[in-house]
Amino acid sequence: MARYSLRKPTYEDIPRLQYFEQVEGKGTEIGLVLKSEDDWKYVIDTYEYFLLCVDNEEDGLVWGYILAAQVENNLWIREIFFCKEYRDDPEKRKNIKLEGFGGVENMPLYGAVKYAKERGGVVIAPIASDNERAISAMLGAYGFRHDRTIERWYDPKHLVIYIEDTGTKPYQNV
């Protein structure tokens, strides 16, 4: 079994999701809009692509998530969040990037690309202009392309929109 897996969230996950927003996401765009328990229930019940990242070697610890909404046949990424520990620890980060999910086809963002491609759509990923790690992943590993920049969206930061419209597997260029 792969170290990491994805699963759909349940209402029991809401305290962990609120912790991500209120504590781990403080000072980031994730923490700009804090969701109540009812808000999270609505998200769990209605969003078409919402998966939690689970560490199978740590008793099923939820360490991140990807949240996206289907707009027509496209997938609009609302949030991607990974705990600081999993972003910053070299071994855990290596596993996130490479075979930690048991192959690239099981990775959170590639799943979103596949989901959109199966519906004849694209993945739209808005990112704060100073989020260098996310931008690097979108451009380098996942082959997204820059679509447009909306100035001062996060005042004073810009919002940069990337699109993946090929459906290709990640890490082909690495």
Question: Whereabouts are the PLM-identified features?
Answer:
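Conserved beta-strand-loop-alpha-helix junction that forms the acyl-donor binding cleft
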Residues: I124-S136, W153-Y154
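Conserved acetyl-CoA-binding loop-helix of GNAT-fold acetyltransferases
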Residues: P90-K114, A141
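C-terminal "cap" of GNAT-fold acetyltransferases
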Residues: R148-V174
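A short beta-loop-alpha structural element at the N-terminal edge
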Residues: R3-Y19
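Conserved acetyl-CoA-binding loop of GNAT-fold acetyltransferases
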Residues: M138-T149
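Conserved acetyl-CoA binding element of GNAT-fold acetyltransferases
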Residues: N73-L98
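Active-site rim helix/loop that mediates acceptor-substrate recognition in acyltransferases
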Residues: T28-V54, L67
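Glycine-rich phosphate/pyrophosphate-binding loop shared by adenosine-nucleotide-utilizing enzymes
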Residues: A2-Y4, E57-Y65, L75
